[in-house]
């Protein structure tokens, strides 16, 4: 049975941060929530009970049951709905008697909320001052408010990812294998794959910049002969490198998954490569990649 009484939820974030959007919670907190709620037991409310409290319908819950991380997918789907917030999530966990979750994750949730507020304040402070007449003539980038399948159309709760995948259409089969190995296993990583996650109809350059810089913690580059001919991949790679000069933040991870006739790109030679073609290290490939993407 869930531990604690009425005061057990005292470790939860204070009311000043509870109205924040669910996007304030980072991947570490979401994974720990999954560890608590993915387990189906008879003595504690699990993710299905939470989904019902969030007003998900029966068929929607059945669809979530097919996912490797149903709690994570539930949070992703819920954060785009009206009324979804950190405070509401805590209220539902309290209602379900999951005081153990509140006690264990309360400090981490509070930390995430404070970081989110600080980042919002910094972004607001860095905005250039403009004359009202001039500002009114500048087109607003509303297109970036709803660019992925689980985005909030108003831009209040943008979808976030562990990694952006830079690839050519001809390499899509390897990208699909990457999805199976990293998303549908115990790693439970969340990848941004353009053909799957990005909505059609907007500028590819603007979308790539937004996702790489603001939505994804890292970028995986699937290097192949076709990659070398892609202007889109070239732009994405150079943009990611510009955000982390010298690769000090380990932001970009190159992958070589098949033999190449052309020379490996010189711009990536100074970064450690994940080599899927080496039979001696192939058994360690997915573990190394998953750990690299899981770093804070």
From Swiss-Prot:
It is found in: Cytoplasm; Nucleus. Changing residue 39 to M: Found in hematological malignancies; uncertain significance; somatic mutation. One of its GO terms (molecular function) is signaling adaptor activity. The intermediate domain (ID) is required for the phosphorylation and activation of IRAK. The keyword ATP-binding does not apply. The keyword Metal-binding does not apply. Changing residue 204 to F: Found in hematological malignancies; uncertain significance; somatic mutation. Ubiquitous. Homodimer. Also forms heterodimers with TIRAP. Binds to TLR2, TLR5, IRAK1, IRAK2 and IRAK4 via their respective TIR domains. Interacts with IL18R1. Interacts with BMX, IL1RL1, IKBKE and IRF7. Interacts with LRRFIP1 and LRRFIP2; this interaction positively regulates Toll-like receptor (TLR) signaling in response to agonist. Interacts with FLII. LRRFIP1 and LRRFIP2 compete with FLII for MYD88-binding. Interacts with IRF1. Upon IL1B treatment, forms a complex with PELI1, IRAK1, IRAK4 and TRAF6; this complex recruits MAP3K7/TAK1, TAB1 and TAB2 to mediate NF-kappa-B activation. (Microbial infection) In case of infection, interacts with uropathogenic E.coli protein TcpC; suppressing Toll-like receptor (TLR)-mediated cytokine production. PROSITE patterns: DEATH_DOMAIN, TIR. GO terms for cellular component: cell surface; cytoplasm; cytosol; endosome membrane; extrinsic component of cytoplasmic side of plasma membrane; extrinsic component of plasma membrane; nucleus; plasma membrane. Ubiquitinated; undergoes 'Lys-63'-linked polyubiquitination. OTUD4 specifically hydrolyzes 'Lys-63'-linked polyubiquitinated MYD88. Deubiquitinated by USP3 that cleaves 'Lys-63'-linked ubiquitin chains leading to inhibition of MYD88-induced NF-kappa-B signaling. Residues 110-155 are annotated as: Intermediate domain. Residues 159-293 form the TIR domain. This is Myeloid differentiation primary response protein MyD88. Residues 54-109 form the Death domain. Changing residue 34 to Y: Rare variant; uncertain significance; loss of NF-kappa-B complex activation; loss of interaction with IRAK4; reduces homooligomerization. It is linked to Immunodeficiency 68: An autosomal recessive primary immunodeficiency characterized by life-threatening, often recurrent, pyogenic bacterial infections, including invasive pneumococcal disease, beginning in infancy or early childhood. The modification Phosphoserine is found at residue 244.
